[in-house]
Structures are given as C-alpha cells and as structure tokens.
C-alpha cells in the first residue's frame, strides 16, 4: 500500500534518565529514531537527578543527532533538584517543544502535554478528605487534569495525542508492586482523554509496568518507559514506533504500532510515493 505524506510516524521513549556522564549513550538510538520517524515524543524523566548539567548533556546529544521535531514533558526525576525552570529553558533552547499544559502541532497532528500526578486509580483513588496535606496532594492531580483538559480543548487537529509522565490508567502500571500504584498515576487524567476523543496516549514512570492498555472508552495508552521497552521487546531498539494516517478519509484509523523492523527504514516524509508493504500491527509481549 502506498505510503504518502498523509502518514506520520511517531517514535516514543520515556525515562531516559540522562546523567552528567550520559554523553553519547543514546545517540545510536536517536539516530535510528531520526531515520525512522517524523516526530519524537519524550514523556518525562529526561534527567536522572533533575540537574541543569544533565539537561545540557541531553540537549547536546539531541541537537547533534535528532533532526525531527521533539516533544517532551517533565517527569518526577526532573523536579528532584528544584531546577525545573533551567531544564525547560536548556531543552527549549535546543529546539525541544516542552509542554506543560501547552500544545504543539505538526504534520496535521496535535500534541497536548502535562506531567500528570499521583493519586491512584478507580475505586482505589485517593479522595480530598481529611488533613490539608492530603487535600493538597489530591488537588495537584486535579490541577494537572484541568491543565490537560485545557490543552486538549485548544487543539484543532483531527488527531490529538496526549503526552503524560504519570499513567492515566491502571492497566499500564500492572507489574509494579500494588502498594505503590497510588504513586504511579491517577485516573483523574483519564477523564479529559475521553471528552476530547484523543487518538492515543503516551506515558512513562512505571518501569515495571505493561507496554499497552486502554481507557474505559477504548483509547490506546502506551507505557513507553525505556525500562519497559527493553524488558518486553529485548530484540528491538528501545523505542516504540507508530504510524498515524492523517488523511480526512481515515480520521478514525488511530495509531498502528510497527513491529517488523523491515518497515522502519526512512521516515514517511522522506518516502514520497514509494510503496513498501503495509506495516504489521504489533502484538505486545507480556510484561
């Protein structure tokens, strides 16, 4: 089937935890992503200890190797040293689209991103009751959900991609100790996703979770933590690659994971009217 400019390839990997000594560590991975995708998503934990020096190392590797748009949100590790503002500035100056209740559109696809927060899922979610510190904890999750809702509402693209660090559903954190589920995400983040008919959701944070799940309304959710990808797909480079058809006739097609590395090759915007075989849908391995 012909692969024209109405097909966008999205690469995603989270929790890369760049340190001061990480220079060059992921450049081979970034080079393959640049060759294969039209957009790269980085859903948080960009640095290990939340240091500006770590962000500078990542910025150098990205500017040297990645020649496609990069869209990112911060993760909890990026907050560790209180240097979030510096990290955002360093990466933004390097060309990364840093989202925090913001949006970005490219190739006919709209991206909305927030960090998200904790609180748990479903009937096990923490309620705003009791001590002020508990209410403050819950209100942080509520505020992140409201920021996500506001960002999604501003998108005018037919295809909307949500980028989070924390999980919006329980499915993709299964495999982690159940005792820490409340600290891995919040189902409050799920509500805006369904309201605005999001095409797909990408998150990280849960290093021992599952790579795929879905919201109650069937929206696909992908845990693209670097650690999950290495564990679940040991025979592949540690990033996920997806195709999204953006033609008006296929607005409901959603994203299709690409499993067969023979179909990775050049990104769609370079392929013009060439006609490789249609990529096969990926069957997720158990976590």
What annotation goes with each model-predicted range?
Residues 81-82, 86-119:
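Hydrophobic alpha-helical segments and helix pairs
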Residues 7-17, 108-120, 161-163, 220-226:
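Active-site-proximal beta-strand elements of phosphoester/diester hydrolases
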Residues 12-14, 40-45, 70-76, 97-101, ...:
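Active-site neighborhood of phospho(di)ester-bond hydrolases with catalytic His/Asp-centered motifs
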Residues 59, 126-132, 155-197:
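Active-site-proximal segments of metal-dependent phosphoesterases and phosphodiesterases across multiple
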Residues 109-157, 182-187, 237, 244:
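Binuclear metal-dependent hydrolase catalytic cores centered on His/Asp/Glu-rich metal-binding motifs
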Residues 1-68, 78-82, 134, 138, ...:
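N-terminal active-site segment of His-dependent metallophosphoesterases
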Residues 22-26, 46-63, 74, 79-94, ...:
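Metal-dependent catalytic neighborhoods of phosphoester/phosphodiester hydrolases
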Residues 2-7, 105, 179, 187-199, ...:
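Binuclear metal-dependent phosphoesterase catalytic core
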């Amino acid at each position: 089937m012909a692969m024209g400019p109405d097909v966008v390839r999205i690469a995603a990997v989270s929790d890369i935890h760049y340190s001061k000594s990480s220079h060059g560590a992921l450049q081979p991975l970034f080079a393959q992503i640049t060759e294969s995708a039209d957009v790269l998503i980085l859903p948080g934990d960009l640095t290990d200890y939340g240091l500006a020096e770590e962000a500078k190392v990542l910025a150098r590797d990205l500017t040297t190797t990645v020649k496609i748009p990069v869209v990112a949100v911060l993760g909890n590790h990026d907050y560790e040293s209180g240097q979030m503002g510096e990290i955002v500035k360093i990466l933004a100056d390097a060309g990364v689209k840093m989202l925090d209740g913001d949006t970005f559109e490219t190739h006919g696809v709209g991206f909305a991103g927030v960090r998200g927060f904790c609180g748990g899922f479903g009937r096990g979610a923490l309620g705003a009751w009791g001590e002020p510190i508990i209410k403050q904890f819950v209100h942080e999750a509520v505020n992140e959900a409201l920021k996500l809702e506001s960002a999604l509402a501003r998108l005018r693209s037919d295809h909307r991609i949500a980028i989070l660090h924390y999980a919006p559903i329980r499915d993709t954190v299964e495999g982690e100790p159940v005792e820490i589920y409340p600290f891995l995400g919040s189902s409050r983040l799920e509500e805006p996703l369904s309201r605005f008919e999001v095409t797909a959701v990408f998150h990280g944070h849960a290093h021992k979770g599952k790579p795929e799940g879905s919201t109650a309304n069937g929206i696909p959710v992908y845990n693209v933590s670097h650690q999950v990808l290495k564990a679940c797909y040991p025979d592949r480079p540690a990033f996920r690659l997806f195709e999204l058809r953006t033609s008006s006739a296929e607005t409901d097609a959603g994203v299709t994971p690409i499993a067969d590395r023979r179909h990775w090759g050049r990104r769609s915007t370079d392929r013009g009217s060439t006609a490789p075989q249609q990529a096969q849908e990926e069957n997720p391995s158990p976590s």
